[in-house]
Amino acid sequence: MRGRLCVGLHLMSTTSRSTLMIVGLGNPGSEYETTRHNIGFMVVDAFAAAVDEQWTHPSSLFDEARTRYAGIEVVLIKPLTYMNLSGKAVAKRSRELGISPTRVVIVTDEYNFPVGKLHLKQGGSSGGHNGVASVIDELETANFWRLRCGIDRRFGPGELVEYVLAPFDASQKDDLAAMIDRGCEAIRQIAKLGPALAMQKINTNGS
């Protein structure tokens, strides 16, 4: 019995090291596709298209696409729970696959950065982001990674919700496209190097 348990724990730890989960935060539905809050969906959609992988629907909580890149399995997740309950999908799938929170990267919007800026960090508070807060609550740790994508801060008091649920400005089209491309490259670097080693490169080139 002890031998079986040790083998099981070894397999789980191996899976945790070799599998990377990339979670794009956003809201499901065509009405939200181009909104600022959905930049996470945009990045993982673009990466899935770049590696020619299709999305599947293994759970009512999320869509998923899988690929192998740089010798590891990369699991892409889009929660279908709406932003404020995103953590339910992240917790369910990461536990099913035995993926440690330190191998989970959340791709999310950040209004404190201009459009085009990317920044990778591990841990910390939610920064008032309800999707990130939900992931912290459901994983019972803040020790996952966040790839934060700038959406700019063009709103006044009481206008945050309306702002994040509105599309990017037409004048930001080129910066948005470049940021999505760099988001895909960031995922490649994280897969190749691991988040800790990729962080400096991503943040140096994050504009």
Question: What are the residue ranges of the model-derived segments?
Answer:
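Nucleotide and nucleotide-moiety/phosphate-recognizing core
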Residues: R2, V7-G123, A133-L147, R154-E159, ...
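The feature captures the short pre-catalytic strand/loop hairpin that immediately precedes
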Residues: G158-F168
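Short, loop-centered acidic/histidine patches that primarily coordinate divalent metals
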Residues: C149-D152, F168
